[in-house]
Amino acid sequence: MSLKIRLARAGSKKRPYYHIVVADVRSPRDGRFIETVGAWNPMLAKDAERVKLDADRIQHWIAQGAQPTDRVLRFLDQAGLAKRPTRSNPTKGEPGKKAQERLAMAKQAEEEAAAKAAEAAAAAAAPAEEAASE
């Protein structure tokens, strides 16, 4: 039997409240569970009452092989009960392929315009030099 430490939604419509439960992976989100090991009230401001965890029972279930879900792992990491691996995706903030092509085209057009302006300035200065020498 594979176990997860996950959130089970409670509360009323538009007023969420979650129980942190140990459940079999095959059972429904709000269905049968083995034990309640905490609670999360997302409606509260970020304080100590927002997330309540039973540290001893969580450690017990992790030792038994229960895997926390991503959101629960965040809570456990903040509480110092488990370590969440850091994710590194250095290309996430970069623009997409087409946007990069558009930026390259704009940069090339800007360079060409600057080169033409430099040629025009040089051509305007050259006749003045010839007239001064004659």
From Swiss-Prot:
The keyword rRNA-binding does not apply. Residues 80-134 are annotated as: Disordered. It comes from the Bacteria. GO terms for cellular component: cytoplasm; small ribosomal subunit. Keywords: Ribonucleoprotein, Ribosomal protein. The keyword Chloroplast does not apply. Residues 115-134 have a biased composition (Low complexity). SUPFAM superfamilies: Ribosomal protein S16 (SSF54565). GO terms for biological process: translation. GO terms for molecular function: structural constituent of ribosome. InterPro entries: Ribosomal_bS16, Ribosomal_bS16_dom_sf. Belongs to the bacterial ribosomal protein bS16 family. PANTHER family: 30S RIBOSOMAL PROTEIN S16, SMALL RIBOSOMAL SUBUNIT PROTEIN BS16M. This is Small ribosomal subunit protein bS16. It comes from Brucella anthropi (strain ATCC 49188 / DSM 6882 / CCUG 24695 / JCM 21032 / LMG 3331 / NBRC 15819 / NCTC 12168 / Alc 37).
